[in-house]
Amino acid sequence: MFRRVFVPACLAALMMVLVSPPATAGVIWEEGSFDEVMARAKKADKPVMIDFYAVWCGPCKLLEKKTYADAQVTAFSNKFVNTKVDVEKGEGVELAKRFRIMNYPTVLFLRPDGSEIDRLIGFLEPPEFLQLMKDYYNGVNTLDDYEARMNEDPGNIELVFTVGRKYVDRADRESAMPILDKVMAMDPDNEKGYAEQALMQMADAERKAGDISAAIAFGEKFVESYPESENTKGVLYDIAYYHKKAGDNEAALGVYKDLITKYPDDVNALNSFAWFCAKSGMALDLATDIAQNACKLSNDDPGILDTLAEVYFARDMYDDAIETIKKAMAKDPEDDYLKEQLSKFEEAKKLAES
């Protein structure tokens, strides 16, 4: 995609002589199926960068708007064949299963033969993203690289932990757990802070393997062992999510209530509570108050407004839902997800009035 520059007619003659190249407006994404993209990569002998995303995912949108728009990221991305995969549509559903994509966004880096180099999970600022792109392109700080270094220096707890974490990132519990057990043994009193990190990774490994009961047990052990840790909030999020995934919404609601009690001014905690209530149909009166407060604290962030709109929608308050989502759209008018939300609310109102 290129930015077009318009100039006065009197400069047209000069422009015929002196023309500067157009500036790229972001990463160029290849169209086509996965097999077609891989065939192009193999022919060009280039690695592949695949952005696995969901349309509703806030960090995915931020990665697109901020990181992929960065000039240096854009320039270096030309060393890859780049493509985007919607994990909820078409072959994206199967590709997400094939590569064990369980967090969004996940940016997967593959060799031309289709084998994995490494992956990035979540939003990263442009400088960090760029550095890791360069590292992975050069085979540095990948799982293979860290594992080789760990084998040369097995007493280095940072290397051991990083290898374990990278296996968790790939949803490889069998490889991850023995390594994370070793981390726990190397830092039994958590003096270096690695024991609690390992416990968090163990919970995530079990979650990705589908053993939700084990994930909950590891999470609860963390909260009991490290109640004042800066990571406790995130672990409470995880425990609530695990209960929800297991179908125990009552237990999930209890954890979410603990979360907003412990962190009453945390926008993400409030938003998570309200979103859960909207989707589960539980505690909707309280969720309305909580979501309204989250909107105030976030200065009406579009994503938080969307949550409030969903709470109204769950209460059949369609006019309020429509008004709120329009407020979100005014702040982010190009967001397709918000447009879909408006259509959903308007259709529901029509059905209710028919």
Question: Model-derived features: where do they sit?
Answer:
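Alpha-helical adaptor scaffolds
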Residues: 199-208, 220, 233-245, 250, ...
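Register position in tetratricopeptide repeats
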Residues: 135, 139, 169, 208, ...
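Local sequence-structure signature of Cys/Sec-based thiol-disulfide redox active-site neighborhoods
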Residues: 27-69
